[in-house]
């Protein structure tokens, strides 16, 4: 899978997770299709996809044994680093520590890890 395809997988899984886990109606930006996603966000999705892919590869696939919480924490931490890369002063919600994230976001981050994992097998 190419970096672009991986980034799209990240975004499409994010949108599916938001639709499944978000309570009520999500903000439009949460479900913006890939074609309309800002370039910085595409780059961030690509980077996090690649970090998860490499993490799985470097563990010889054994990172799949992580709990859903551990998978979610990994994705969230990678995403936070991208927010600091792309924004001088990111919004606090963009860089919140994992325990402070809403449950829907934690679940969606786990879904992202598992979608990348599945794409590699």
What annotation goes with each model-predicted range?
Residues 1-121:
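Alpha-helical propensity feature that highlights long, continuous alpha-helices across diverse contexts
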């Amino acid at each position: 899978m190419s970096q672009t395809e991986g980034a799209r997988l990240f975004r499409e899984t994010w949108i599916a997770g938001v639709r499944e886990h978000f309570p009520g109606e999500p903000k439009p930006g949460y479900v913006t299709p890939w074609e309309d996603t800002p370039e910085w966000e595409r780059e961030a999705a690509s980077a996090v996809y690649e970090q998860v892919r490499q993490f799985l590869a470097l563990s010889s696939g054994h990172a799949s044994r992580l709990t859903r919480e551990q998978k979610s924490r990994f994705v969230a931490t990678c995403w936070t680093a991208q927010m600091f890369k792309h924004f001088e002063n990111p919004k606090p919600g963009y860089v919140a520590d994992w325990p402070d994230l809403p449950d829907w976001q934690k679940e969606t981050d786990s879904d992202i890890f598992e979608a990348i994992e599945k794409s590699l097998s």
